[in-house]
């Protein structure tokens, strides 16, 4: 699973002109399931997302998590995070989980974040979405963990 986290002042996602999710101060998490994602992988990435200290404390240092600051998370599925762009000019998405597996992984990630005490809004899996955000920083972090244990934590 890959999770691209952006610290935001606010963010929203809409499908066909209808807002499906919105947050104020918090995180926008772009999420991509990969084949073989396990509950352990998904849980670890959700915990890391919830606990990553990327918000400033009183001294101006990144020392607080989204939980610490009372922020929310907007989760948006984005299979293009696994794009292979090394060969030719058209990206390949063959490393993305199949749709039904990707949906299950995405839903499990959102459930795990809620289990960490976070309020989560979402986009609509598989839909063409418009995402609006106001970056705070900007501060963007890429988390990637595979079922075989490879990847950053």
What is the role of each PLM region?
Residues 71-73, 133-138:
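A short, glycine/Asx- and small/polar-enriched loop/turn
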Residues 9-11:
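RNA/tRNA-interacting regions in translation and RNA-turnover enzymes
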Residues 18-70, 80-111, 116, 121:
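Compact, glycine-rich, soluble single-domain proteins
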Residues 93-96, 136-153:
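Short, low-complexity, polybasic intrinsically disordered segments
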Residues 45, 76, 139:
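Residue-level signal for inorganic ion chemistry
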Residues 119, 126, 130-134:
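GST superfamily/GST-like fold recognition
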